[in-house]
Regions:
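Short loop/turn motifs that connect adjacent beta-strands in outer-membrane beta-barrel proteins
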Residues: 61-76, 88-89, 117-126, 174-197, ...
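Transmembrane beta-strand segments of Gram-negative outer membrane beta-barrel proteins
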Residues: 68-95, 100, 198-200, 222-223, ...
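Residues that define the transmembrane beta-barrel architecture of outer-membrane proteins
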Residues: 72, 106-112, 160-165, 242-246, ...
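Transmembrane beta-barrel strands of outer-membrane/channel proteins
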Residues: 76, 80-84, 128-132, 200-204, ...
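Surface-exposed coil loops of outer-membrane beta-barrel proteins
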Residues: 142-166, 176-288, 327, 416-427
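Signature for the C-terminal beta-barrel architecture of outer-membrane proteins
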Residues: 227-345, 350-355, 359-366, 373, ...
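Outer membrane beta-barrel transmembrane domains
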Residues: 290, 305-335, 356, 363, ...
Length: 479
Protein backbone atom coordinates (compact mmCIF):
# COMPACT_ATOMS: atom_id res chain seq x y z
CA UNK A 1 0.00 0.00 0.00
CA UNK A 2 0.73 3.15 -0.01
CA UNK A 3 0.02 6.57 0.78
CA UNK A 4 1.04 10.74 1.12
CA UNK A 5 3.50 12.04 3.50
CA UNK A 6 4.49 15.23 5.21
CA UNK A 7 7.95 16.69 5.39
CA UNK A 8 10.25 15.69 8.18
CA UNK A 9 10.04 19.26 9.41
CA UNK A 10 6.36 18.77 10.15
CA UNK A 11 5.90 18.31 13.90
CA UNK A 12 5.44 14.77 14.75
CA UNK A 13 5.21 13.73 9.26
CA UNK A 14 3.38 9.26 2.59
CA UNK A 15 2.33 8.19 0.45
CA UNK A 16 2.56 8.01 1.01
CA UNK A 17 1.68 5.39 2.96
CA UNK A 18 4.68 5.07 0.97
CA UNK A 19 3.65 8.43 -0.42
CA UNK A 20 5.61 11.58 -0.73
CA UNK A 21 4.22 14.85 0.47
CA UNK A 22 0.63 15.77 -0.18
CA UNK A 23 0.27 17.02 -3.73
CA UNK A 24 -3.00 18.78 -3.03
CA UNK A 25 -1.84 22.11 -1.66
CA UNK A 26 1.89 22.84 -1.37
CA UNK A 27 2.84 23.38 2.26
CA UNK A 28 4.06 26.77 3.39
CA UNK A 29 7.70 27.75 3.70
CA UNK A 30 8.16 27.25 7.45
CA UNK A 31 6.92 23.76 8.27
CA UNK A 32 7.87 24.04 11.95
CA UNK A 33 5.43 26.95 12.27
CA UNK A 34 2.16 25.04 12.69
CA UNK A 35 0.20 28.28 12.39
CA UNK A 36 1.23 28.37 8.71
CA UNK A 37 0.08 24.80 7.99
CA UNK A 38 -1.98 24.74 4.79
CA UNK A 39 -5.05 23.24 5.28
CA UNK A 40 10.25 1.24 -4.48
CA UNK A 41 13.35 -0.17 -6.07
CA UNK A 42 16.90 -1.04 -5.76
CA UNK A 43 18.83 -0.50 -2.58
CA UNK A 44 20.02 2.99 -1.67
CA UNK A 45 23.61 1.82 -2.06
CA UNK A 46 22.95 1.17 -5.75
CA UNK A 47 22.35 4.91 -6.26
CA UNK A 48 25.38 7.25 -6.26
CA UNK A 49 24.38 9.24 -3.21
CA UNK A 50 27.33 11.61 -3.50
CA UNK A 51 26.21 12.62 -6.98
CA UNK A 52 22.65 13.19 -5.79
CA UNK A 53 23.80 15.37 -2.91
CA UNK A 54 26.16 17.42 -5.08
CA UNK A 55 23.57 18.02 -7.78
CA UNK A 56 20.97 18.95 -5.20
CA UNK A 57 23.34 21.41 -3.54
CA UNK A 58 24.03 23.08 -6.89
CA UNK A 59 20.30 23.46 -7.49
CA UNK A 60 19.74 24.92 -4.04
CA UNK A 61 22.63 27.37 -4.44
CA UNK A 62 21.18 28.57 -7.73
CA UNK A 63 17.75 29.02 -6.17
CA UNK A 64 19.21 31.03 -3.27
CA UNK A 65 20.69 33.58 -5.66
CA UNK A 66 17.20 34.54 -6.79
CA UNK A 67 14.88 36.95 -5.07
CA UNK A 68 12.39 35.35 -2.65
CA UNK A 69 9.53 35.93 -5.10
CA UNK A 70 11.39 34.23 -7.97
CA UNK A 71 9.42 31.23 -9.23
CA UNK A 72 11.36 27.98 -9.44
CA UNK A 73 11.16 26.58 -12.98
CA UNK A 74 11.88 22.95 -12.21
CA UNK A 75 13.10 20.69 -9.43
CA UNK A 76 13.93 17.11 -8.60
CA UNK A 77 14.12 15.08 -5.42
CA UNK A 78 14.78 11.49 -4.35
CA UNK A 79 14.04 9.27 -1.37
CA UNK A 80 14.93 5.77 -0.23
CA UNK A 81 13.29 3.78 2.57
CA UNK A 82 14.38 0.35 3.83
CA UNK A 83 12.27 -1.47 6.45
CA UNK A 84 13.02 -4.77 8.18
CA UNK A 85 10.40 -6.43 10.42
CA UNK A 86 10.41 -9.55 12.57
CA UNK A 87 7.77 -11.34 14.58
CA UNK A 88 8.39 -14.32 16.89
CA UNK A 89 6.05 -17.30 16.99
CA UNK A 90 2.61 -16.82 18.53
CA UNK A 91 -0.46 -18.83 19.53
CA UNK A 92 -2.62 -19.98 16.60
CA UNK A 93 -4.80 -23.11 16.93
CA UNK A 94 -5.58 -22.95 13.20
CA UNK A 95 -4.65 -21.00 10.08
CA UNK A 96 -6.30 -20.17 6.76
CA UNK A 97 -5.28 -18.91 3.33
CA UNK A 98 -4.85 -15.30 4.49
CA UNK A 99 -3.43 -15.91 7.97
CA UNK A 100 -0.21 -14.45 9.26
CA UNK A 101 2.31 -17.23 9.79
CA UNK A 102 2.42 -18.34 13.44
CA UNK A 103 6.14 -19.21 13.26
CA UNK A 104 8.87 -16.62 13.58
CA UNK A 105 9.44 -14.62 10.41
CA UNK A 106 11.64 -11.83 9.00
CA UNK A 107 10.81 -9.74 5.92
CA UNK A 108 12.15 -6.56 4.34
CA UNK A 109 10.98 -3.90 1.90
CA UNK A 110 12.91 -1.32 -0.10
CA UNK A 111 11.59 1.69 -1.99
CA UNK A 112 13.26 4.38 -4.10
CA UNK A 113 11.47 7.36 -5.64
CA UNK A 114 12.78 9.92 -8.12
CA UNK A 115 10.57 13.02 -8.33
CA UNK A 116 10.64 15.80 -10.92
CA UNK A 117 8.52 18.91 -11.37
CA UNK A 118 8.23 21.49 -14.15
CA UNK A 119 6.47 24.84 -14.18
CA UNK A 120 4.44 25.24 -17.37
CA UNK A 121 2.20 28.26 -17.95
CA UNK A 122 0.79 30.60 -15.30
CA UNK A 123 -0.46 28.59 -12.33
CA UNK A 124 0.35 25.23 -13.95
CA UNK A 125 2.83 22.54 -12.89
CA UNK A 126 3.54 19.00 -14.07
CA UNK A 127 4.99 16.39 -11.71
CA UNK A 128 6.24 12.84 -12.12
CA UNK A 129 7.26 10.13 -9.63
CA UNK A 130 9.24 7.11 -10.76
CA UNK A 131 9.01 4.34 -8.15
CA UNK A 132 11.23 1.29 -7.75
CA UNK A 133 10.41 -1.25 -5.04
CA UNK A 134 11.46 -4.67 -3.80
CA UNK A 135 10.56 -6.98 -0.93
CA UNK A 136 7.62 -8.46 0.94
CA UNK A 137 5.52 -7.70 3.97
CA UNK A 138 5.28 -10.29 6.73
CA UNK A 139 3.32 -13.34 5.51
CA UNK A 140 2.82 -11.80 2.05
CA UNK A 141 1.10 -8.79 3.64
CA UNK A 142 -1.75 -10.85 5.11
CA UNK A 143 -3.32 -11.72 8.44
CA UNK A 144 -3.41 -8.32 10.20
CA UNK A 145 -5.83 -5.50 9.36
CA UNK A 146 -3.72 -2.68 10.76
CA UNK A 147 -0.83 -4.09 8.79
CA UNK A 148 2.57 -3.37 10.28
CA UNK A 149 4.45 -1.98 7.25
CA UNK A 150 3.04 0.84 5.14
CA UNK A 151 5.77 0.22 2.57
CA UNK A 152 4.61 -3.38 2.02
CA UNK A 153 2.56 -3.80 -1.13
CA UNK A 154 0.35 -6.81 -1.68
CA UNK A 155 2.31 -7.14 -4.91
CA UNK A 156 5.63 -8.23 -3.37
CA UNK A 157 8.70 -9.00 -5.47
CA UNK A 158 12.11 -10.63 -5.02
CA UNK A 159 13.76 -8.37 -7.60
CA UNK A 160 13.42 -4.61 -8.04
CA UNK A 161 10.32 -3.56 -10.01
CA UNK A 162 9.69 -0.19 -11.65
CA UNK A 163 6.45 1.77 -11.84
CA UNK A 164 5.38 5.26 -12.92
CA UNK A 165 3.60 5.93 -9.65
CA UNK A 166 2.49 9.48 -10.41
CA UNK A 167 2.18 11.69 -13.47
CA UNK A 168 -0.18 14.61 -13.05
CA UNK A 169 -0.91 18.22 -13.95
CA UNK A 170 -1.90 20.78 -11.32
CA UNK A 171 -3.54 24.07 -12.29
CA UNK A 172 -4.13 26.81 -9.72
CA UNK A 173 -6.58 29.71 -10.20
CA UNK A 174 -6.25 32.78 -7.98
CA UNK A 175 -9.35 34.10 -6.20
CA UNK A 176 -7.67 37.17 -4.71
CA UNK A 177 -4.48 39.21 -4.53
CA UNK A 178 -2.90 37.65 -1.43
CA UNK A 179 0.08 35.32 -1.86
CA UNK A 180 1.73 32.66 0.29
CA UNK A 181 5.31 31.36 0.03
CA UNK A 182 5.84 27.76 -1.14
CA UNK A 183 8.90 25.67 -0.33
CA UNK A 184 10.85 23.48 -2.73
CA UNK A 185 9.87 19.85 -2.14
CA UNK A 186 8.47 16.85 -4.02
CA UNK A 187 5.37 17.91 -5.95
CA UNK A 188 5.87 21.62 -5.24
CA UNK A 189 8.03 24.27 -6.92
CA UNK A 190 9.43 27.06 -4.77
CA UNK A 191 7.76 30.43 -5.17
CA UNK A 192 4.34 31.68 -4.21
CA UNK A 193 0.73 30.59 -4.51
CA UNK A 194 -2.56 32.47 -4.06
CA UNK A 195 -3.81 32.45 -0.47
CA UNK A 196 -7.35 32.03 -1.82
CA UNK A 197 -7.43 29.64 -4.76
CA UNK A 198 -9.05 26.87 -6.72
CA UNK A 199 -6.76 23.97 -7.58
CA UNK A 200 -7.39 21.28 -10.19
CA UNK A 201 -5.20 18.16 -10.17
CA UNK A 202 -5.61 15.61 -12.94
CA UNK A 203 -3.63 12.49 -13.85
CA UNK A 204 -2.16 9.51 -12.03
CA UNK A 205 -1.70 9.92 -8.29
CA UNK A 206 -2.72 8.54 -4.91
CA UNK A 207 -6.07 9.70 -3.56
CA UNK A 208 -4.28 9.82 -0.20
CA UNK A 209 -1.97 12.51 -1.56
CA UNK A 210 -4.86 14.96 -1.41
CA UNK A 211 -7.35 13.59 1.14
CA UNK A 212 -7.13 12.46 4.79
CA UNK A 213 -3.76 14.06 5.52
CA UNK A 214 -2.52 14.41 9.10
CA UNK A 215 0.58 16.20 10.37
CA UNK A 216 1.41 13.50 12.93
CA UNK A 217 0.23 10.24 11.36
CA UNK A 218 0.41 10.20 7.59
CA UNK A 219 3.68 8.79 6.27
CA UNK A 220 5.02 5.29 6.86
CA UNK A 221 8.45 6.42 5.63
CA UNK A 222 8.99 8.91 8.45
CA UNK A 223 6.23 8.38 11.03
CA UNK A 224 4.08 5.43 12.15
CA UNK A 225 4.34 2.29 9.99
CA UNK A 226 0.90 0.80 10.74
CA UNK A 227 -1.61 1.12 7.89
CA UNK A 228 -4.32 2.41 10.23
CA UNK A 229 -2.01 5.23 11.33
CA UNK A 230 -1.28 6.55 7.85
CA UNK A 231 -4.88 6.52 6.55
CA UNK A 232 -8.45 6.01 7.66
CA UNK A 233 -8.83 2.25 7.17
CA UNK A 234 -12.61 2.47 6.89
CA UNK A 235 -12.11 4.53 3.71
CA UNK A 236 -11.76 2.01 0.88
CA UNK A 237 -9.92 4.62 -1.12
CA UNK A 238 -9.58 4.17 -4.90
CA UNK A 239 -6.24 2.57 -5.74
CA UNK A 240 -4.56 -0.34 -7.44
CA UNK A 241 -2.49 -2.83 -5.44
CA UNK A 242 0.39 -0.31 -5.31
CA UNK A 243 -1.81 2.49 -3.98
CA UNK A 244 -2.23 4.64 -7.11
CA UNK A 245 -4.98 5.41 -9.61
CA UNK A 246 -6.02 7.95 -12.25
CA UNK A 247 -8.52 10.68 -11.63
CA UNK A 248 -9.01 14.31 -10.77
CA UNK A 249 -9.37 16.45 -7.67
CA UNK A 250 -10.83 19.93 -7.31
CA UNK A 251 -10.04 22.05 -4.25
CA UNK A 252 -11.26 25.38 -2.93
CA UNK A 253 -8.76 26.69 -0.40
CA UNK A 254 -9.17 29.68 1.89
CA UNK A 255 -6.81 30.83 4.67
CA UNK A 256 -8.75 28.98 7.38
CA UNK A 257 -10.64 26.26 5.52
CA UNK A 258 -10.74 24.10 2.42
CA UNK A 259 -13.22 21.94 0.51
CA UNK A 260 -12.07 19.11 -1.75
CA UNK A 261 -13.74 16.75 -4.21
CA UNK A 262 -12.17 13.82 -6.03
CA UNK A 263 -13.27 11.40 -8.74
CA UNK A 264 -11.03 8.37 -9.31
CA UNK A 265 -10.86 5.15 -11.29
CA UNK A 266 -11.37 1.80 -9.51
CA UNK A 267 -9.53 -1.49 -10.13
CA UNK A 268 -11.16 -4.27 -12.13
CA UNK A 269 -10.78 -6.79 -9.28
CA UNK A 270 -10.37 -6.50 -5.52
CA UNK A 271 -6.91 -5.06 -4.78
CA UNK A 272 -6.00 -5.65 -8.43
CA UNK A 273 -3.44 -3.94 -10.65
CA UNK A 274 -5.62 -3.37 -13.75
CA UNK A 275 -8.15 -0.54 -13.77
CA UNK A 276 -11.79 -1.16 -14.65
CA UNK A 277 -12.48 0.41 -18.09
CA UNK A 278 -16.21 0.86 -17.33
CA UNK A 279 -15.78 4.46 -16.18
CA UNK A 280 -19.49 5.11 -15.66
CA UNK A 281 -19.86 2.05 -13.41
CA UNK A 282 -16.50 1.76 -11.64
CA UNK A 283 -15.45 4.90 -9.79
CA UNK A 284 -14.70 6.32 -6.39
CA UNK A 285 -15.87 9.75 -5.24
CA UNK A 286 -14.68 11.51 -2.09
CA UNK A 287 -15.45 14.88 -0.51
CA UNK A 288 -13.55 16.48 2.36
CA UNK A 289 -14.05 19.63 4.42
CA UNK A 290 -11.05 20.96 6.33
CA UNK A 291 -11.11 23.61 9.08
CA UNK A 292 -7.90 25.08 10.47
CA UNK A 293 -7.97 26.94 13.79
CA UNK A 294 -6.01 27.99 16.87
CA UNK A 295 -6.64 26.52 20.31
CA UNK A 296 -5.13 29.34 22.30
CA UNK A 297 -1.82 29.69 20.50
CA UNK A 298 -1.72 26.05 19.37
CA UNK A 299 -2.81 25.17 15.82
CA UNK A 300 -5.21 22.38 15.02
CA UNK A 301 -7.09 20.99 12.04
CA UNK A 302 -10.35 19.05 11.70
CA UNK A 303 -11.22 17.17 8.51
CA UNK A 304 -14.57 15.57 7.69
CA UNK A 305 -14.62 13.04 4.85
CA UNK A 306 -17.40 11.23 2.98
CA UNK A 307 -16.98 8.75 0.15
CA UNK A 308 -19.04 6.72 -2.30
CA UNK A 309 -17.56 3.91 -4.40
CA UNK A 310 -19.03 1.92 -7.24
CA UNK A 311 -17.34 -1.28 -8.42
CA UNK A 312 -17.98 -4.88 -9.47
CA UNK A 313 -18.18 -5.95 -5.82
CA UNK A 314 -19.59 -9.07 -4.24
CA UNK A 315 -22.20 -9.02 -1.47
CA UNK A 316 -21.43 -10.66 1.89
CA UNK A 317 -25.11 -11.38 2.50
CA UNK A 318 -25.52 -12.97 -0.93
CA UNK A 319 -22.45 -15.14 -0.30
CA UNK A 320 -23.86 -16.28 3.06
CA UNK A 321 -27.16 -17.24 1.45
CA UNK A 322 -25.52 -19.71 -0.94
CA UNK A 323 -24.69 -23.27 0.23
CA UNK A 324 -21.08 -22.94 -0.96
CA UNK A 325 -18.50 -23.28 1.80
CA UNK A 326 -16.05 -21.73 2.25
CA UNK A 327 -18.19 -18.73 1.40
CA UNK A 328 -17.26 -17.25 -1.97
CA UNK A 329 -18.00 -13.55 -2.35
CA UNK A 330 -16.49 -13.42 -5.84
CA UNK A 331 -19.35 -15.52 -7.22
CA UNK A 332 -21.82 -12.78 -6.23
CA UNK A 333 -20.09 -9.87 -7.95
CA UNK A 334 -22.05 -7.18 -9.73
CA UNK A 335 -21.78 -3.40 -9.79
CA UNK A 336 -22.69 -2.19 -6.32
CA UNK A 337 -22.10 0.83 -4.08
CA UNK A 338 -20.08 1.24 -0.91
CA UNK A 339 -20.07 4.38 1.23
CA UNK A 340 -18.60 5.70 4.44
CA UNK A 341 -17.49 8.65 6.55
CA UNK A 342 -14.35 9.75 8.35
CA UNK A 343 -13.17 12.23 10.98
CA UNK A 344 -9.53 13.30 11.16
CA UNK A 345 -8.19 15.63 13.88
CA UNK A 346 -4.70 16.92 14.63
CA UNK A 347 -3.95 19.25 17.54
CA UNK A 348 -0.78 20.73 18.95
CA UNK A 349 -1.10 20.47 22.74
CA UNK A 350 2.07 22.31 23.68
CA UNK A 351 5.16 23.10 21.66
CA UNK A 352 6.77 19.84 20.45
CA UNK A 353 3.78 17.72 21.51
CA UNK A 354 0.86 16.93 19.23
CA UNK A 355 -2.14 14.62 19.40
CA UNK A 356 -4.23 13.08 16.63
CA UNK A 357 -7.20 10.84 16.04
CA UNK A 358 -9.05 9.25 13.14
CA UNK A 359 -12.55 7.78 13.30
CA UNK A 360 -14.06 5.95 10.34
CA UNK A 361 -17.23 4.07 9.42
CA UNK A 362 -18.34 2.27 6.25
CA UNK A 363 -21.54 0.37 5.51
CA UNK A 364 -19.63 -2.95 5.39
CA UNK A 365 -22.21 -4.79 3.28
CA UNK A 366 -20.18 -5.31 0.12
CA UNK A 367 -16.76 -6.66 -0.71
CA UNK A 368 -13.61 -4.87 0.49
CA UNK A 369 -12.12 -3.59 -2.73
CA UNK A 370 -8.92 -1.55 -2.50
CA UNK A 371 -7.41 -1.05 0.97
CA UNK A 372 -8.38 -3.32 3.86
CA UNK A 373 -11.30 -5.26 5.36
CA UNK A 374 -11.93 -2.68 8.09
CA UNK A 375 -15.46 -1.25 8.39
CA UNK A 376 -15.03 0.69 11.66
CA UNK A 377 -11.83 2.28 12.92
CA UNK A 378 -10.66 4.47 15.79
CA UNK A 379 -7.08 5.63 16.30
CA UNK A 380 -5.56 7.90 18.92
CA UNK A 381 -1.94 8.90 19.39
CA UNK A 382 0.77 11.34 20.41
CA UNK A 383 3.83 12.67 18.59
CA UNK A 384 6.70 14.19 20.57
CA UNK A 385 9.56 16.14 19.02
CA UNK A 386 13.05 15.54 20.40
CA UNK A 387 13.64 19.18 21.29
CA UNK A 388 12.50 18.16 24.77
CA UNK A 389 15.81 16.26 25.16
CA UNK A 390 17.98 18.44 22.87
CA UNK A 391 17.35 16.28 19.77
CA UNK A 392 15.01 18.61 17.87
CA UNK A 393 14.94 16.50 14.70
CA UNK A 394 14.10 13.24 16.49
CA UNK A 395 10.52 12.10 17.00
CA UNK A 396 8.79 9.68 19.37
CA UNK A 397 5.33 8.40 18.52
CA UNK A 398 2.84 6.24 20.39
CA UNK A 399 -0.64 5.31 19.17
CA UNK A 400 -3.45 2.82 19.61
CA UNK A 401 -5.74 1.35 16.93
CA UNK A 402 -9.17 -0.30 17.15
CA UNK A 403 -10.38 -1.94 13.93
CA UNK A 404 -13.73 -3.71 13.54
CA UNK A 405 -15.86 -5.39 10.87
CA UNK A 406 -19.59 -5.03 10.25
CA UNK A 407 -21.74 -7.94 11.47
CA UNK A 408 -22.48 -9.45 8.06
CA UNK A 409 -18.81 -9.06 7.16
CA UNK A 410 -17.40 -11.02 10.11
CA UNK A 411 -20.14 -13.64 9.71
CA UNK A 412 -18.84 -14.11 6.16
CA UNK A 413 -15.27 -14.50 7.44
CA UNK A 414 -16.44 -17.01 10.07
CA UNK A 415 -17.64 -19.44 7.37
CA UNK A 416 -14.36 -19.43 5.47
CA UNK A 417 -14.62 -16.22 3.49
CA UNK A 418 -11.49 -14.29 2.59
CA UNK A 419 -10.85 -10.60 2.08
CA UNK A 420 -7.93 -8.35 1.19
CA UNK A 421 -6.09 -9.13 4.44
CA UNK A 422 -8.38 -11.41 6.48
CA UNK A 423 -9.16 -15.10 6.02
CA UNK A 424 -8.28 -17.60 8.75
CA UNK A 425 -10.76 -20.23 7.53
CA UNK A 426 -12.99 -19.45 10.50
CA UNK A 427 -12.80 -17.08 13.45
CA UNK A 428 -14.06 -16.14 16.87
CA UNK A 429 -14.79 -12.49 16.21
CA UNK A 430 -13.12 -9.73 18.18
CA UNK A 431 -12.08 -6.15 17.52
CA UNK A 432 -8.47 -5.98 16.37
CA UNK A 433 -6.40 -3.85 18.76
CA UNK A 434 -2.97 -2.54 17.76
CA UNK A 435 -0.34 -0.57 19.64
CA UNK A 436 2.63 1.10 17.95
CA UNK A 437 5.61 2.89 19.48
CA UNK A 438 8.53 4.28 17.48
CA UNK A 439 11.66 6.40 17.92
CA UNK A 440 12.91 8.22 14.83
CA UNK A 441 16.56 9.28 15.14
CA UNK A 442 18.27 11.82 12.88
CA UNK A 443 21.63 10.38 11.85
CA UNK A 444 22.68 13.25 9.58
CA UNK A 445 20.56 16.03 8.09
CA UNK A 446 18.17 14.12 5.80
CA UNK A 447 19.20 10.62 6.93
CA UNK A 448 17.07 9.05 9.66
CA UNK A 449 16.81 5.65 11.29
CA UNK A 450 13.86 4.34 13.30
CA UNK A 451 13.21 1.61 15.84
CA UNK A 452 9.61 0.42 15.97
CA UNK A 453 7.49 -1.95 18.05
CA UNK A 454 3.90 -3.06 17.40
CA UNK A 455 1.59 -5.31 19.39
CA UNK A 456 -1.43 -6.81 17.63
CA UNK A 457 -4.31 -8.41 19.56
CA UNK A 458 -7.08 -10.31 17.74
CA UNK A 459 -5.28 -10.13 14.37
CA UNK A 460 -7.69 -9.91 11.42
CA UNK A 461 -10.63 -9.81 13.91
CA UNK A 462 -9.80 -13.26 15.34
CA UNK A 463 -9.63 -13.77 19.13
CA UNK A 464 -8.27 -17.30 18.64
CA UNK A 465 -4.95 -16.06 17.23
CA UNK A 466 -2.18 -13.96 18.72
CA UNK A 467 -1.26 -11.64 20.25
CA UNK A 468 1.60 -10.85 17.85
CA UNK A 469 4.68 -8.78 18.68
CA UNK A 470 6.32 -7.13 15.67
CA UNK A 471 9.77 -5.54 15.88
CA UNK A 472 10.95 -3.23 13.11
CA UNK A 473 13.80 -1.00 11.97
CA UNK A 474 13.76 1.63 9.24
CA UNK A 475 16.40 3.60 7.32
CA UNK A 476 15.24 6.63 5.35
CA UNK A 477 17.13 9.27 3.36
CA UNK A 478 15.89 12.00 1.07
CA UNK A 479 17.32 14.77 -1.11
Amino acid sequence: MFVADNSRDTPGASRQMNDPESISEPRLLSRRDQSLRDAHPFKARWMPVAFLAAAKAIGQEAAETNAPVQLQTWNWHAQNTDIVQYHPGFTAPYSGPNSMSSVNEVRETVSLDLYAGLRLWKGAEAHVDGLMWQGFGLSRTLGVEGFSNGEAFRLGTDVPNVNMARLFLRQTFALGEGLEPVEDRPFALAGTQPASRITLTIGKMSAKDIFDNNAYANDSRTQFMNWALMANEAWDYPADSLGYTTGLALELNQPQWAVRYGFFQMPRTSNGTAQDPHYLQAWGMVTEFERRYLWGTHPGTVRLLAYLNSANMGSYQAALETPVRPADVEATREYRYKYGFGLNVEQEIVKNLGAFTRIGWSDGRNEAWTFSDVDRTFTLGLSIKGACWSREDDTVGIAGVFNAAATVHHEFLAVGGTGILAGDGTLTYGIEKDLEVYYDFQVWKTIHTTLDYQLVSNPAFNRDRGPISIFGARLHWEF
